[in-house]
Amino acid sequence: MHHPVILLLCLSSLAGAANLPPEDLSQPVTADVIVPTGGTAILKCTVQEHLESSLQWSNTAQQTLYFGEKRALRDNRIQLVHSSPNELTISISNVVLSDEGEYTCSIFTMPVRTAKAVVTVLGVPQKPQVSGFESAFKENDKAKLRCTTSGSKPAANIKWYKGPEELEGAKTSVLEDGNGKTFTVKSFIEFDVTKDDDGAEITCAVGHESLHDSAKSSSHKIQVQYKPTAKIESRPSMPREGDKLRLQCDAYGNPVPDNYVWERENGEVPLLANIEGNSLVFFNLNKTDSGTYTCKASNTLGTFITHYKLDVNDPSPIPSTSSIDHAVIGGVVAVIAFLLFCLLIVLGRYLIRHKGTYLTHEAKGSDDAPDADTAIINAEGGQGGSDDKKEYFI
């Protein structure tokens, strides 16, 4: 039922399309350009049908820059990139803010056809300058810092960081520069400082579209002065009577603590103890040195007091000389006994192997000496002699 309506709409659309003017193939085509100061702008103009005419580029003051491949304006920053009947491309190097505006590409047909290309020049912000670090902060002070950058177009944005952490709450002001084109941006930040901020890096980062996702920044490390803290360490940790002991007071602060005072609760510091810088030294500990000792560490901002309870233990037991001597003697006796035992074994084996072949001086001196000599001769003569052999023993 709706088919006639749909058909009518389709016919109407076709009729409207038929009434559109045909595409002008001789119309030049250009594109807008955005370039930062100091950069290079590329101006490209193309045409499908040149109709035997040349393309021409003109600047914002309608001065001809190039007509075809012929240079018309003496400006070495402007160079020919490509020239053909269907294209004319030129470049402008070291772009400045005054180069901004509308550039015209023309083709001298009948009628003359033109196309505009808008060149936008970005003002690159300068490296930011940060103030407020002229002197050190004191703990719990409020830091007030300012960051300034000039020459940006459009106006730059500024962010603050403490280490990797972004600081919130900054206030920003934007002022137009004297040239009427660029801007100066100022950012102010305030925050309370603690001793943990001593040495922290504060960064002012400037962001701008001319910086291509990077940022110009300035960083400074802040100094925070604070009262000292301290603790006492014992060396050795388990002191005994007769030891040398060093009680060392390790203090931290800004400025560095430079004054140390040692005291003893309910008494005087022993006369034989020496104060060496931040240390109290006992050269020969005594039981009477036990007690609570106090170290007062000071800098220009204040004093910190820390305590240490000293308990002197009994001297280490020393083994007696007599017990050492007994052990040595016992060891020597054991060695000698072992050697004698070995000697007896060797001697016994020797006697067994030479049984019946011994002749003593006493035997030689007796009445049976000739028989003893004969026994020796028979023994040396082997088994070939008589079976009757005499043996002489002591």
From Swiss-Prot:
GO terms for biological process: homophilic cell adhesion via plasma membrane adhesion molecules. GO terms for cellular component: anchoring junction; presynaptic membrane. Residues 22-120 form the Ig-like V-type domain. Keywords: Cell adhesion, Cell junction, Cell membrane, Disulfide bond, Immunoglobulin domain, Membrane, Repeat, Signal, Transmembrane, Transmembrane helix. Residues 1-17 form the signal peptide. Disulfide bonds join C45-C105, C147-C204, C249-C295. Residues 230-240 have a biased composition (Basic and acidic residues). Residues 217-240, 363-394 are annotated as: Disordered. The keyword Aminoacyl-tRNA synthetase does not apply. It is found in: Cell membrane; Cell junction. May be involved in cell-cell adhesion. Belongs to the nectin family. This is Cell adhesion molecule 3. The lineage of its organism: Eukaryota, Metazoa, Chordata, Craniata, Vertebrata. The gene is cadm3.
